[in-house]
Each structure stands twice: as C-alpha cells, then as structure tokens.
C-alpha cells in the first residue's frame, strides 16, 4: 500500500496545528515520522486514520483519493494505529483481546468458539515469535509481549500499514530486539510501518526513511543512508543544538546523601552508595533490576525495611514522602501522567501542589504568590503554553515533563531524583532538561538520574551506579564507564 498526504492543514479553535504538511510511505517501508513534541505528528496520523477531519489537503492511497470517516473504517481498509498507551484489556485473555469485536461464534447462538479462538491466537503470535497460550490473561504479559499482541491484532484485520507511536518507550532492550525482528519479518511481506519516536539510535537502526515536521509544517524527507543525526536534529528544531549533552562544569563536593545496606524485601537488598554535592549519579540496570524501587525508598514512597540513610552526615528516617520533602529531596517519577501530574489541573495548580506552604500567607494560599511562582517557573524552564491556566493534559510530553520538574524546583531540592527524565521527550526539550540538571549541580545540589538510555547515562553522569537483580552490580567512575562495562555489570558479569 502506497500512501501520499499532500498539503494537509488542521486547526483547533482557530489555532493551526498543521500547515501544508506532507507525508508519503511506500509498500514494505519502515518510515520514521519525527519532530519536536507539538510538531503535529500524531495529529497528522489521526487525520490519516479518520480520527480527525482535515481542513485542507489530499490523501491518496494507491493513486486513489481517500477519506476515512473514523478509525474503524481506516482499519477495515488496512491501516492500523497502535498508540503509546496500548489498547489491551488486562482482565481478558490473549485470544479475547485479539478477537475483540470480531469474536467467532457457533452460528447466532452467542456462544463463543473459545478453543478455536485460542488456537488461532496462539498460531498468529507464534508466527511473530511470541509463544504464549491464547487462554492466558493479557495482564500477565510484559508490555513488550502486549505490543506484539497489538501487532497481531492489526494483522488479523489484514493491515498493510501499521502506525506505531513511541513503540519502545516502556520496553527492555531484549523486547526491542524482538519487536525489530517482527518488523523486519513483516516488511519483507509488504507491510509498511510508520514509526513515531524520539529515539534516534532506533530510527537509524530500523527505518528506511525519515519525514520531519516542525511547528505543523513539512520540513523535509531523508533516506537513512543519506542523512546523519546532526542533520535530523537541525531539521527538527530549526537550528543546530550543538553538542548532544552539555558540558559539565560543576565542582564535586562533600557527600550529601548516603544509603547503607538499604533493603526492601522482594525488591532489593544491601544497597550502599553515596552521592556528592555537585554530582550527577547515573543509575543503570536492566528493567526490573530494582532501580525505581530504590528511588521510591529514598523518597519514602516505599520505605526501607532495613538499612540507613544519611543526609549531610546525619542519619535521618524517611518513612513517607513528607519526610523526604522536609529533607529537600524531590522525586520526578518515570510515569509523569499517572504519578507526576494531575492531568485535569492547570499548570498553576500542579506547580502549587508540593509548594502550598511557601505559597501561603498565614494558612491561606496566596493567589499573588501562586501567580508569580507560576510565571517564574514557566519562564525558567521555557514551558510552552498559552498561560498558567492551561490544563497540563493539553501540553506536549516535553512541556509536561518541564511542569513536573518545575513543581519540585519550588522546594529548592538539595537532592533531585529523576527517573527516566527524557522518556517520550523531543531532542530540544531533552537539551533543556540536561541544562536544568547542570544548573542544579553547579549550585551545589546533587542529582540522581535513572535512565535506560545508555548514551544519556554516559553523556550526563559523573559516576554510574549499576543495579543487578536488586543488588549493586558496581559503581563506575566516568573514565571507566562505557556501554560495554555497564551492560557487563547489569547482566551479572564483571
């Protein structure tokens, strides 16, 4: 299937989000759609699949002009959209998820052909390299396995084009390899993929071509062999952003935080490490190794069962997030939408949440202080929004992440914990987040950064703490750290 979108325009409430956008994909092609958050990538694909009606432009499929009334019609025609938030019902079986809305029945009796559906589901998944039983509950599978189920569902509707939005955001390295194997198998069979992602290494590994949007407009198309990381970044942001990771200039000082023999039953045991003033400590390890559990313990979200925590040399008890905040410890969680933000609240309301005491006069929240704090933080972090009253759910991923960071900067943290700080964030916003981390450490504060992106860990960390199966695999100085040395420790080697 060959799709061509020309001069596509779309506005919401008079605000243009797409202006003469273009996109073209060939049969059997894996085509990346890139741009900063808010560039219009998802909107363009929603227009293709009938979720939104375009204001102008044309869509041709195999030479014939087409318009879909809704996503179901697009799916029936062979175009499937797998969203970042997977459409899997955890309490249904694998087969029930795959046959949802198209169940096999005995005539008109309403009785399901459960055994037949289970067998077909197992066979379809086995062809994609996933060997699970159709009768298993989908909620028992990993996110990577659920993603393969989504692809299998699309293929059951005879999809010729599969759109994937941030497909690897929550996958382990092994699951990413499995996904790429499936994509490579299907592209040989003529299936095309639109691959929306910010992960440059993956795009250069799996894709054939890249189309770039900026501020809702078509910037250009490049074939992978003919372009470079720097050119793509420059096209996305409209300027050269210089070095990928900003230079570190902070002075490393005394120990600000220490954990000794920290243990949480079933999660991690005997974890000991230090963080110093002015330092960024990177934390690496495989998914499920216990990295996030350790951070939750530091923040008092899931307190230690045993072990000690010291702040500036003094032992402290952290049994709740309130205890952590009193010690000026801030935690920016990996799941900003469900744990970091109240999506229906405005930017102002989200920023106020951990800062109610400092924004109050007496015991009454001061509107004046709140408004000033919101304006200051939006300016400091370059949050792109119409005003502080805009609902955070309407912001791009990068701007949502900036709001999460901004609300915690209000407590003037001496230790800032960032868990996957740039997941789902575009290149320009990543650079701004890195600059915030550097600014904090230059002022003598400390940062712990948990990341699954090894180039990010290597580019930003002064030292790297590697966690393996709930234990400290090792701690690497900057000059010792490499992708190979980190992975060796993360997998139990030396």
Curated annotation (Swiss-Prot):
SMART domains: AAA. GO terms for cellular component: plasma membrane. Keywords: ATP-binding, Cell membrane, Membrane, Nucleotide-binding, Repeat, Sugar transport, Translocase, Transport. It is a peripheral membrane protein. It catalyses: D-ribose(out) + ATP + H2O = D-ribose(in) + ADP + phosphate + H(+). It is found in: Cell membrane. Its main location: membrane. This is Ribose import ATP-binding protein RbsA. It comes from Bacillus anthracis. The lineage of its organism: Bacteria, Bacillati, Bacillota, Bacilli, Bacillales.
